């Protein structure tokens, strides 16, 4: 089942965060994920939110996500993300495909 990592970011040190961004795709391309959203001007439709960036990435399953997120390559560059931005990141499961439903039902 597909999973999605949704990150809300508050970038407070653009230079440090920029080092992370500059290396991100070189690491990410080696894994099974897709970047679906990377928006530095999200529009709040309801509620209050003071973040200044939203990122959504998808993976075919949780194991693939963890292969990337827990890789030494990613952990090295993530230090710049953590130093340059405050983040809230959630991992959510997608809706099962018809094939996945048929296998379980």
Regions found by a protein language model. Give the residues of each.
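Generic beta-strand structural signal
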Residues: 53-55, 87-88
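Short S/T/G/P-rich N-terminal loop/turn motif that feeds into the first structured element of a domain
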Residues: 1-54, 60-70, 93-105
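C-terminal structural segments of small proteins and small subunits
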Residues: 66, 74-92
């Amino acid at each position: 089942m597909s999973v999605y990592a949704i990150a809300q970011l508050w970038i407070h040190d653009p230079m440090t965060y920029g080092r992370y961004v500059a290396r991100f795709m070189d690491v990410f391309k080696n894994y099974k994920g897709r970047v679906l959203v990377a928006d530095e001007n999200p529009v709040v439709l309801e509620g209050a939110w003071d973040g200044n960036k939203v990122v959504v990435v998808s993976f075919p399953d949780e194991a693939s996500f963890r292969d990337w997120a827990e890789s030494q390559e990613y952990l090295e560059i993530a230090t710049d993300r953590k130093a340059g931005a405050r983040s809230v990141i959630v991992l959510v499961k997608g809706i099962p495909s018809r094939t996945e439903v048929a296998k379980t039902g």
